[in-house]
């Protein structure tokens, strides 16, 4: 009986010790890029909520700087979908990804300047441009629809 208890305790301890290794092994290029993009999106939502509040100016500027850092890191990564393409299609896809990220980083810089200068209307315009860039890029690259609600009734006429 003691041998069975010891064996089951040993198996439990080994499983608990090895489980985190599974989690780290799943951290591949897709999840790295996804993590950077999620961080940009999270900070962008916070900026959108607080950019008009002068009391949160420093926080807003910090969030924008973090967005820029994440975007710069994302620019060094290859989108996972590019690995499924070959030749000219792959080159075109990666070039589009880099072009869209460069445009995003440029608009983040303009947003940072607008917030720093307390130009709320200009900041709002930059936020709108960034949101449009995100939507257009995601549509062009075929990404970003994973988190949308897919349930409910079909559109009329189907």
Tell what function each PLM region has:
Residues 11-13, 23-24:
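Cleavable N-terminal signal peptides
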Residues 24-65, 156-157:
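Immediate post-signal-peptide N-terminus of mature secreted/exported proteins
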Residues 74-96, 145:
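Short, solvent-exposed, charged loop/turn and helix-capping segments
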Residues 35, 39-42, 46, 62, ...:
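Charged, amphipathic alpha-helical oligomerization/scaffolding segments
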Residues 1-12:
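Bacterial N-terminal signal peptides that target proteins for export
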Residues 110-158:
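C-terminal amphipathic alpha-helix
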Residues 45-61, 104-127:
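Amphipathic, charged alpha-helical scaffolds that flank and support histidine-based chemistry
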Residues 18-22:
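N-terminal signal peptide c-region/cleavage motif recognized by signal peptidases
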């Amino acid at each position: 009986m003691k041998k069975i208890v010891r064996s089951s305790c040993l198996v439990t301890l080994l499983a608990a010790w090895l489980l985190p290794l599974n989690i780290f092994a799943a951290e591949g290029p897709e999840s790295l890029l996804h993590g950077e993009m999620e961080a940009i999106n999270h900070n962008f939502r916070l900026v959108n909520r607080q950019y008009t509040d002068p009391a949160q100016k420093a926080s807003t500027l910090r969030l924008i700087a973090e967005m820029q850092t994440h975007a710069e890191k994302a620019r060094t990564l290859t989108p996972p979908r590019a690995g499924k393409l070959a030749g000219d299609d792959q080159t075109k896809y990666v070039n589009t990804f880099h072009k869209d990220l460069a445009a995003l980083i440029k608009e983040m810089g303009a947003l940072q300047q607008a917030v720093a200068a307390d130009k709320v209307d200009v900041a709002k315009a930059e936020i709108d441009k960034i949101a449009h860039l995100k939507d257009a890029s995601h549509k062009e690259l075929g990404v970003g629809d994973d988190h949308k609600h897919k349930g409910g009734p079909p559109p009329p006429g189907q």
